[in-house]
């Protein structure tokens, strides 16, 4: 009898306003949705909290998108550099997965829910999908070298937005940016010209030089 009374007491406790969510932060179209707890939590409050939530949520989405695209390329890359790219992309996938988990947990630590739903990725990521089917190794290299830069630039905005009000979040985002910049270099180095080798990528691209990477438009 005491057991059921205790369970009832706990149920009543969690039904009180103290355990309710204090609100959501979401865009006009409902994505992403980050519920904010009314319970005491770590991290910043007010505007600083909202800035950190936005920075962490966008970083989470881009890392999840990169998880999907690194696997797509890992499976389907074809050409001379199949094996080294196959292995490298697995390493990159594992790295972005690790940081995605840390970013999501930081959202929870500062009192917000993490939105990692498929629809949220589709609607809010600024990184496009890889093409379907088999993918040429030169295409994989330029795709990742370009889009890692897109993600790094976005993370950089989050670092600046959170550095004054939430240095812990800013420091975490700096770690993530460091990893993404390393991955970008590892791709770019495969077609990086040097004083002794123009390294046009033609040997990977049926004798045709790989078009130079263009810097993506700034993140919105």
Regions found by a protein language model. Give the residues of each.
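Iron-associated oxidoreductase/ferritin-like identity signal
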Residues: 3-6, 17-220
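Conserved ASCE/P-loop NTPase catalytic core
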Residues: 9
